[in-house]
Amino acid sequence: MKEFPKHYNFIENEKKWQHIWQELQIYAYNPNMSKEGIYIVDTPPPTVSGQLHIGHIYSYTQTDFIVRFQRMIGKNIFYPIGFDDNGLPTERLVEKQKQIKAYNMERDEFIKICQEVVQNEEAKFRNLFKQIALSVDWSLEYQTISPLSRKISQMSFLDLLHKGEVYRANQPILWDTVDGTALAQADIEDKQKISSMNYIMFKTEQGDKLTIATTRPELLPACVAVFYHPDDGRYKHLADKSAITPLFNEKVPILADPLVQQDKGTGLVMCCTFGDQTDITWWKSHNLPLKTIITKKGTINFPHKIDLDGLTIKEARTKIIDILKEQNLLTKQEEITQTVKCAERSGAPLEILTVTQWFIKTITHKEALLKRTNELNWYPKNMQMRLENWINSLSWDWCISRQRYFGVPFPIWYSKRIGEEGKILYADISQLPVDPLKDLPIGYSKEEVDPDLDVMDTWATSSVSPQLSTYGISEDFAINKVRHDKLFPMDLRPQAHEIIRTWAFYTILKSHLHQNILPWKNIMVSGWCLAEDRSKMSKSKGNVLVPEKLLERYGADVIRYWSANSKLGADTAYSEDIMKNGKRLVNKLWNAAKFVSIHFDKLTSEDKKVSLCAIKEKITHEFDQWIINKLVALVKLATNALQNYEYANAIYLTEKFFWSIFCDNYLEISKTRSYDEGNKNPQGQYSSILTSYHVMQTLLKLFAPFMPHITEELYQILYSKNSIHIQGNWVNYGDLNYDIDVQGPEGLLTILDIVRKFKAEYNLSIKAPIKLLEVSGIILSTELVEDLKNVTSAEAIQFEMKDDKIKVNIKLFV
């Protein structure tokens, strides 16, 4: 045993062990072991879009608890880390940080700046992840913008293209006018906004007045029809008639459709191309004409005597309303609160434009994807409903085209050869990764092709995060098929609940389309970290917690302890009280270990080397046997909890045992025996020291997944030169059990509790001598009586069985 330092310095020790673990490759994956013994994790690659906050630490450490446990029970851990460093989120970071705009620069120059920024940001991420002791294998690190990742992402696209699951179409899509790009349904969020319901006067072709309510009067020039519900008796007489739009005097058909809400507005609706999803449905089902008046920049393009050209949407709305009022065509306005679909990143209200884009088929696979969600093991189970609700709500195929620069390009060109103009040309697998702006399709010259200028949605690459580590996509598209087959599908996907609709859904979709299989067997979903007042953390509120400052104040083990005290999937508020409890636990572990170690030199070196099961007969004392039985039960409960991803229950049970059973009771009760100053009971002394030796060792192992630094330091001082975190170092007591009557030891604890309360009530020292304890309701064995005398400072104890319930009469010295 090493010399025990006087104090535990978490700053020095955490840095020391992080360096040693890295140097000794404690967490390295062994590629030579069989597939059966591997535990494979699809670690979330954090988006390089800003500073990591405490919420990231919260979820990443929860994954690490499970990974460390799996390693300790003997699994060969494949635990990579990646950085999602391409796409719109990263571009927005670069534009903000460098005060530039991508569209004002040369494409290559902007990409170069992006690469420099992500390199610096990833160094910060990497350092923080090491500081909080994520036990990842850093040799498995990847970046989603790297040549290898681009190759795998382009392989995914080509595989789906060959399978007929990808198509290119000129159709309505969601468009962000601020970032100037198409978006997918998963990239939007609903926001409540104050608006006006405007009641506008239309006329029939015959001159009859019709009132139509709308929140988008600026779309009047794009009106292509008027609809009513077929069961609405107010408007059945309008069948086969036409309406004349106000101001623009365009003739449009009046049609019946069951999607009209009779109780909304006047029950008459104008269909414009396009205001919402319903407009698209009507446009398609009724074969209506297309009138596009909104540009990609969010301005109006509509030459007319009513001059709207070049106005923003908001400006056009105001102008239209003013003119309608002037001409007495606006009969009423009502202030309403409406749900507006906005871009998740820019926050801008979305428009629906008709643009040629690439899509992955999604709608046709909804039923199959719902079945997949049932095949997956969800932790916690209630999170499954979120994905099912999302799948059921889908109404668009996945648009994967983005009109940006820093992303994975489509491996596509369009032919300009005479006779095949517009023909889609795609890269050969041997060419990947390709940049169609610089590279050429086989057999074509630069003059014969136009490159696809778009890049893929960042989720199109993130959705193959497992494959970025396995180096394969499918039977036909793989860089290393042997590696892919060994590592795919994976065991675990850890992630936060807010990206179930994106990362979880898209990864399941891609895996289903590529190989008709789930990408992983289990998914553990973490909640959000909230501010102390339970509000969402945000920079505008000034309540965002910076992990680096907390690490300086408390250290990684304490932060990890706080994270472990939150149930999986729950949104949890940051708590200073829990942080203080964690700090208290670190100190108590140190002091308890230091206390019990005083006597470890009395144990033989042989007894220290072997498992407790091999020398169980040397635990001779009844109270020692009782705590070992309790310890064995704890190990089983904690193991079962961690196997079911219930890390919070595992640490709760372990901490409760440590404080209540081991420190507060066992160490106090057995202390006199351990010292055995008069050499009265050498067998009882050896039994208690051996018990403390194994209980402390077991507790360190149970705490190790949560608090890796303090447990490593104590384990190295007390037990072994090998790391506590090595593969296969979990506790396994098998069927170890001492056949004892628990009523005796537990009766002792009941009596002790009564005595402690008595002394506290009368402000007596815990060591205050007692002349006599008169105990009824139980009779203890001789060795338990000696322990009870020692811990209560009682001169004598008398027992009788006149009561069923334990009662104690305490007599003090006069």
Swiss-Prot record:
| Gene Ontology CC terms, in alphabetical order | cytosol
Kindly list the positions annotated as binding ATP: 539
A GO term (biological process) for this protein?
valyl-tRNA aminoacylation
Q: Name one GO molecular function term.
A: valine-tRNA ligase activity
- Where does the UniProt annotation locate this protein? Cytoplasm
Q: Which reaction does it catalyse?
A: tRNA(Val) + L-valine + ATP = L-valyl-tRNA(Val) + AMP + diphosphate
Enzyme Commission designation: 6.1.1.9
- Motif 'KMSKS' region — list its residue ranges: 536-540
What InterPro entries does this protein's entry cite? aa-tRNA-synth_I_CS, aa-tRNA-synth_Ia, Anticodon_Ia_Val, M/V/L/I-tRNA-synth_anticd-bd, Rossmann-like_a/b/a_fold, tRNAsynth_Ia_anticodon-bd, Val/Leu/Ile-tRNA-synth_edit, Valine-tRNA_ligase_type_2
| Metal-binding among keywords | no
Pfam families (alphabetical): Anticodon_1, tRNA-synt_1
Give the record's keywords alphabetically.
Aminoacyl-tRNA synthetase, ATP-binding, Cytoplasm, Ligase, Nucleotide-binding, Protein biosynthesis
Report the protein name in the record.
Answer: Valine--tRNA ligase
Please give the organism: Rickettsia typhi (strain ATCC VR-144 / Wilmington)
Q: What is the lineage of its organism?
A: Bacteria, Pseudomonadati, Pseudomonadota, Alphaproteobacteria, Rickettsiales
Gene behind the chain: valS
